[in-house]
């Protein structure tokens, strides 16, 4: 029975994944040429004029990853050419480097398909490890439903392009899996670390750090270590806290300081001025990270800056994920409280606050994929209360409409970005 259940999961996940991707690429192929000519001008500069396929996969920010990758390969530099390009994962641009532009696109799209597929199975394993086996079939069904929902991501068209979301959420989820495998809770809610799995716990920090290098919101994953540290402090396990969460958190924080402060300062300053001049006590570290500075200056990111009448459509685009994330937080805080869920809830609360009050709110549809809390809420609701959870049903219906719609809009270079 168990083997049959696992085989069914394998079959359903594979069929769903490849069916969704075929549908998306079919929509891209059928989409009309984009009204925006900036991508075509960029491609023509590199001698690609005959195939409109490339232009359809390179909408919105995709072009920045390509341009930086080409710049690094041709110039020999390990940093972007212009200040605003630092906001688009230089690490991902290095990874997708190739001999020419067409090969870069092919490499990036292939990597993203592979990463999305692999991360689907990571979600499957993480779900089975996180939730107690009340019954093998129930646990497997929860993992299967979560994995299918992960395939049906609201990121849609962004996941078949050159964006860095897939590599970010793959390593985010892998880090969660490593951490979850290393810990356990007793009936009193006390955290216990398996000393034989110390390397696994430490590996989670490297995964989170690499995810952060590709998507800055993954810095919030450091809250896992804050949670673990506080729990161990309560038990007065000082040595364990030092060698587990404190060491792991220090690695993540060190990567943050180096790549968002010191490295860009060394590359841009003192010639840049402005950002370079706001140093902390004369150290080569400005008060504000370069990423925050770029977001504020070039994309008008800041508290309530996005709360303007012309951005109402963008709030509507992001509303389904805002509502489902809020419901997931409430569900796991009160209706299904679990020690395992506590750090996920912390991360989701801060993430939701940032998305609604500080960021360009519509990007929640693609960047929320780094955290599986909402997927677990939907899956658990569909299994336990299939006839009562109206909001969950509406969200799933919205996904089924949104994925093909957004993919087609993306291929035509139309909002939302």
From Swiss-Prot:
State the organism named in the record.
Kluyveromyces lactis (strain ATCC 8585 / CBS 2359 / DSM 70799 / NBRC 1267 / NRRL Y-1140 / WM37)
An example GO biological process term is:
GPI anchor biosynthetic process
Q: What PANTHER family does this protein map onto?
A: GPI MANNOSYLTRANSFERASE 2
Q: Which domain of life is it from?
A: Eukaryota
Regions that span the bilayer: 10-30, 104-124, 142-162, 167-187, 206-226, 239-259, 312-332, 344-364, 394-414
**Topology class, membrane:** Multi-pass membrane protein
**Family from the record:** Belongs to the PIGV family.
GO terms assigned for molecular function: alpha-1,6-mannosyltransferase activity; glycolipid mannosyltransferase activity
- This protein's name: GPI mannosyltransferase 2
Q: In which pathway does it act?
A: Glycolipid biosynthesis; glycosylphosphatidylinositol-anchor biosynthesis
Mind listing the UniProt keywords for this protein, alphabetically? Endoplasmic reticulum, Glycosyltransferase, GPI-anchor biosynthesis, Membrane, Transferase, Transmembrane, Transmembrane helix
